């Protein structure tokens, strides 16, 4: 789901300064499975290959709600879970260098452990993207599900 942010060209109240930008918000569902302690990038709808595409010269605020459900494994306990909320932002410059800042991280509920979760750069040379990167213990089978809300400002000014 994507919601647009109005006019492309916006000015201050006196029209002394006008800037061209796109503003939008979106909610994306990411999911995936881990069976060992390998760091894993969640994919859009769990398709195994799609991440969240990004534009340069942008600021993206993110709000992640993520659930980790243990489903077994030799070291896992089926039914253990964690539910967390992580908020932050990423600055993406003209060359697609990304600077991530976490402003808030909270454990909402859990039985067992949390695992780890961060927003990460998943770019290739031809497609620039981000995703939620997750990791837990070896020999634990987990189903991960994340609802990610983004607030994007994409500027035509280079930085």
Predicted regions and their residues:
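Periodic small-residue-enriched repeat registers in elongated scaffold domains
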Residues: 1-44, 146-151
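Short amphipathic beta-strand and strand-loop transition segments with alternating hydrophobic
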Residues: 49-52, 66, 115-123, 133
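Hydrophobic beta-strand residues in large extracellular and virion-surface proteins
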Residues: 2, 64-66, 130-132
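Noncatalytic modules at the cell exterior or secretory-pathway interfaces
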Residues: 122-136, 141
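Short, surface-exposed beta-strand/loop "edge" segments at domain boundaries and coil↔beta transitions
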Residues: 35-37, 68-79, 111, 136-145
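Extracellular attachment/recognition segments
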Residues: 74-127
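C-terminal interaction-tip segments
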Residues: 138-159
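Beta-rich globular "head" domains
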Residues: 44-92, 146-151
């Amino acid at each position: 789901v994507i919601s647009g942010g109005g006019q492309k060209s916006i000015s201050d109240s006196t029209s002394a300064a006008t800037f061209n930008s796109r503003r939008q918000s979106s909610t994306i569902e990411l999911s995936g499975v881990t069976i060992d302690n390998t760091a894993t990038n969640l994919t859009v709808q769990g398709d195994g290959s799609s991440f969240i595409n990004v534009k340069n010269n942008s600021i993206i605020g993110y709000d992640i709600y993520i659930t980790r459900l243990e489903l077994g494994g030799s070291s896992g306990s089926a039914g253990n879970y964690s539910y967390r909320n992580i908020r932050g932002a990423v600055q993406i410059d003209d060359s697609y260098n990304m600077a991530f800042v976490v402003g808030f991280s909270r454990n909402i509920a859990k039985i067992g452990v949390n695992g780890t979760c961060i927003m990460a750069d998943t770019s290739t040379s031809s497609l620039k993207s981000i995703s939620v990167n997750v990791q837990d213990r070896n020999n634990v089978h987990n189903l991960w599900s994340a609802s990610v809300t983004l607030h994007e400002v994409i500027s035509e000014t280079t930085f």
